[in-house]
């Protein structure tokens, strides 16, 4: 009997499913807030925006008057075919106030993988310039090339859920600080689940848990020393003591961000020149 029970135990271990990662975006009808945090006050997170259709579904960070940095997994096929169906709410701590501006174009990183979550980064261009340099509306400072967050406390903000699976909507923006986790420690924690690449870094209270970003926080910024070093990407649950949250490492994408913004400007110039020539030739004839 003991041998039979032992064999049953071995079979159960062999076929046990590893934990699955959860992308920290909500469906487009759900909302929520930071795990283990407190309400933000004016000036805490002026880079923070809410991405919305009919309601909040992801976060993002202002990086210039016309550009928002967010996570690639926040964007779906409908968004790409109809960018104008998405709005950015900024200059607010409250989801019911602030300023709404429509999205003009969306750029998802060409090598983003929804299987590995590598290159989980995207850019949104707004139809009009945002009115910045206000208490709750300031462009985030980008890090230097090669910046690799491995030590210190991340500052996170957002409207993500209190617990994994929650759908409770907060009134105000939440904030929390979370200690960074060494990449090798993080990689070991995620062994057999997902590969932690050089394009990612991790943060969480290993062995303790309780503070983290969660569903609805995806795409929001991870700040370190007042620089936008990361984008909220994925984790196993939220605030799990065994699995730190994983963030896209912004310093790996500075060239991509610059080229993407330039290509949009080049396209706009080309369109304007074509329109001018069309009108000019039409006037002559």
Curated annotation (Swiss-Prot):
Catalytic activity as recorded in UniProt: Preferential cleavage: Arg-|-Xaa, Lys-|-Xaa
Chain positions listed as propeptide in the UniProt record: 17-33
Protein name in the entry: Trypsin Tyr p 3.0101
Signal peptide: 1-16
Sites marked Required for specificity: 212
Presence of the UniProt keyword Glycoprotein in the record: no
Superkingdom of this protein's organism: Eukaryota
The species this protein was found in: Tyrophagus putrescentiae
């Amino acid at each position: 009997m003991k041998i039979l029970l032992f064999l049953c135990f071995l079979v159960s271990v062999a076929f046990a499913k590893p934990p699955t990662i959860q992308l920290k975006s909500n469906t487009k009808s759900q909302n929520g807030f930071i795990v283990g945090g407190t309400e933000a006050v004016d000036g805490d997170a002026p880079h923070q925006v809410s991405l919305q259709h009919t309601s909040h579904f992801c976060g993002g960070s202002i990086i210039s008057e016309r550009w928002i940095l967010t996570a690639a997994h926040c964007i779906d096929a409908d968004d790409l075919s109809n960018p104008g169906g998405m709005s950015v709410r900024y200059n607010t701590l409250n989801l019911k106030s602030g300023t709404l501006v429509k999205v003009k174009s969306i750029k998802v990183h060409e090598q983003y993988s929804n299987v590995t979550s590598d290159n989980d980064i995207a850019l949104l261009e707004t139809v009009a310039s945002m009115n910045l340099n206000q208490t709750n509306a300031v462009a985030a400072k980008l890090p230097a090339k090669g910046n690799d967050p491995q030590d210190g406390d991340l500052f996170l903000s957002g409207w993500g859920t209190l617990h994994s699976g929650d759908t409770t909507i907060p009134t105000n923006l939440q904030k929390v600080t979370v200690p960074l986790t060494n990449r090798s420690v993080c990689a070991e924690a995620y062994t057999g689940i997902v590969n932690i690449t050089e394009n990612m870094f991790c943060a969480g209270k290993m062995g303790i848990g309780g503070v983290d970003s969660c569903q609805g926080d995806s795409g929001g910024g991870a700040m370190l020393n007042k620089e936008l070093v990361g984008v909220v990407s994925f984790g196993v649950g939220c605030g799990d003591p065994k699995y730190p949250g994983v963030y896209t490492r912004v310093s790996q994408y500075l060239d991509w961000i610059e080229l993407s913004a330039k290509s949009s400007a080049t396209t706009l110039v080309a369109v304007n020149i074509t329109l001018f020539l069309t009108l000019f030739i039409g006037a002559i004839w």
